[in-house]
Amino acid sequence: KVKPLPGSGFLKTNIDFCIDWARQHKVRAAVYGVCFIAALEYFSLPNNSLRELQRKNPRITAMMEQREQEADDAGARFAVQQTWVPISRISPHLVHAVIVAEDGTFYEHSGVDWYEVEESIEKNFEKGKAARGGSTISQQLAKNLFLSTSKDPMRKLKELIIALRMEKLLSKKRILEIYLNVVEWGNGVFGAQAAARYYYGVPAASLSASQAARLAVMLPNPRYYDKHRQSSYLIRRTGLILRRM
């Protein structure tokens, strides 16, 4: 008869406890699992590139490259419309509208809104697919600069890690400035200055509150709203953001 290894009963008891706990707390278990994998991934992501952003403006982003490749694969023409401007030359209305629409706790979190992460995981479990993102402005910037629009869980994990690093290296003002200059606002349209010119024929500094609210509402799906500018949802959501500003 084979004798059990010393301590094997204790180990089995603890493993069983962990399994039972995970079954009863699926969302929390998923969050802790993500955090554990994040710790393993932490040292493999762009740190030097983030440091450079303290003083250098990015010339091209992963999102721009992705859109260019998609157009090339489809045999379509594609040109990036973007003009960099300092945040001092972007309408305060737009800055406020984007924060209200995309990340109401921007000045309170450290790159990741963990409550939103847990909520999105719970919603995605319920629907059985990646239906809700819960991304902060910092996470969105990480995706735009270094990653892609893929819904691969590992991509999302890297987004979280980069966002946390970014907040340690860059000020909130700098994060906003970069975000507002590189975020996608339509087919080939990137950044506030290009968006203001493209949709309203004015510089970013001259955007009104209503124009800013409309642009902010477009951010989750800019290429769709570029083609559906009179969408009833877009109009309703714009009114809501205006009232919150």
Where are these regions (language model features)?
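Juxtamembrane regions of bacterial inner-membrane/periplasmic proteins
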Residues: 1-244
